[in-house]
A protein has these predicted regions:
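N-terminal transmembrane-helix/juxtamembrane module of multi-pass inner/ER membrane proteins
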Residues: 1-109, 146-148, 152-167, 286
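Alpha-helical transmembrane segments of multipass membrane proteins
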Residues: 52-57, 137-141, 218, 243-248
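Membrane-water interface at transmembrane helix exits
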Residues: 61-65, 80, 141-145, 149, ...
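Hydrophobic alpha-helical transmembrane segments of integral membrane proteins
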Residues: 125-156, 213-230
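Interfacial segments of alpha-helical transmembrane regions
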Residues: 45-51, 114-140, 208
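Membrane-embedded catalytic cores of phosphoryl/pyrophosphoryl-handling enzymes
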Residues: 158-285
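Alpha-helical transmembrane segments of multi-pass membrane proteins, especially transporters
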Residues: 77, 81, 129-134, 236-237
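Hydrophobic alpha-helical transmembrane segments
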Residues: 101-119, 182-190, 194
């Protein structure tokens, strides 16, 4: 493939992403033009949120069924073998960095830093969301691992050496990936909380894109280290997305029913005239 062809493919991929975002905002604008009344608008917002959570849960259930039936084992193994054949010092360094950023220590640092900021700025509902997402995500990871009891891949012995570091294989079950699930929950929730306070759509996109790259890198590091199958990582992403989305919109529902002023994570410019009853609710305020 020539450089020109690769450039065309990258441009086409970006075009697909832009069209998807434009379609999403088009749906929001259409809803804004047709939904009347504060309660109906907020109800639609919550319905969309819980619908996204159910979508993630449904995809996870479908993937779990394939894994349980052994349909993905051969493909999972081929991916790990291919990665093992294409290791490099740069790849080793990136894998170790990804493993460190997805470790419990890094996640707790991010959690405590975010908690301190939210507490000092008096965003208590956002603080509650962060902790609900973490505690529920950790519990969900343990329950799912014990439910499926999928053994870890053991393709290259009990440990692997990268840049002089001995990386031992975890002893817990493999499905889903805890690193993928908890990074999606913590970094995804933090990105959501930061992005909804950004003044422009471009800044929100950069914030969410940065979090997405970080979460993706953590998941890829688990494959590079061969401590998870690809389906484990994908399952972790889906379960983490479902739980983080459910938590976020659940907290918004509690906030609405207690204060009748939800912090809707949409920009005012993204809404049509029909959503005017909730325009004042779109600004993050101390609660």
């Amino acid at each position: 493939m020539t450089p020109h062809q690769r450039g065309d493919r990258r441009e086409a991929s970006r075009g697909v992403g832009r069209r998807a975002m434009d379609a999403l905002y088009g749906i929001i604008r259409w809803a804004g033009g047709h939904v009347r009344g504060f309660h109906a608008a907020v109800g639609l917002y919550l319905t969309i949120g819980f619908g996204l959570a159910l979508l993630g849960l449904g995809l996870f259930a479908a993937l779990a069924r394939l894994v349980g039936g052994g349909a993905l084992h051969a493909a999972d193994t081929r991916v790990l073998l291919w990665l093992h054949q294409h290791t490099s010092p740069v790849g080793d360094a990136l894998a170790l960095a990804g493993a460190a950023l997805g470790s419990g220590t890094a996640l707790w640092i991010a959690l405590l830093g975010g908690s301190l900021y939210l507490a000092r700025s008096r965003h208590f509902y956002s603080l509650a969301l962060l902790w609900v997402a973490l505690l529920g995500g950790r519990m969900l990871d343990r329950v799912l691992k014990l439910t499926f009891e999928r053994p870890r891949p053991r393709l290259f012995g009990s440990e692997i050496e990268l840049l002089g570091w001995q990386v031992e294989y975890p002893q817990s079950y493999s499905f889903p990936s805890g690193h993928a699930l908890t990074s999606m929950v913590i970094y995804g929730t933090l990105a959501y909380l930061v992005a909804r306070t950004e003044p422009t759509r471009r800044m929100r996109r950069w914030t969410l894109a940065g979090a997405a790259l970080l979460i993706l890198g953590i998941g890829l590091s688990r494959l590079y280290l061969a401590v998870h199958y690809p389906s484990d990582v994908l399952a972790g992403y889906l379960a983490g997305f479902a739980w983080a989305t459910f938590s976020a919109y659940g907290i918004e529902a509690v906030r609405y029913f207690r204060g009748r002023r939800p912090a809707v994570a949409l920009a005012e410019a993204d809404l049509g005239a029909g959503m005017s009853p909730v325009r004042e609710a779109l600004r993050e305020e101390p609660t």
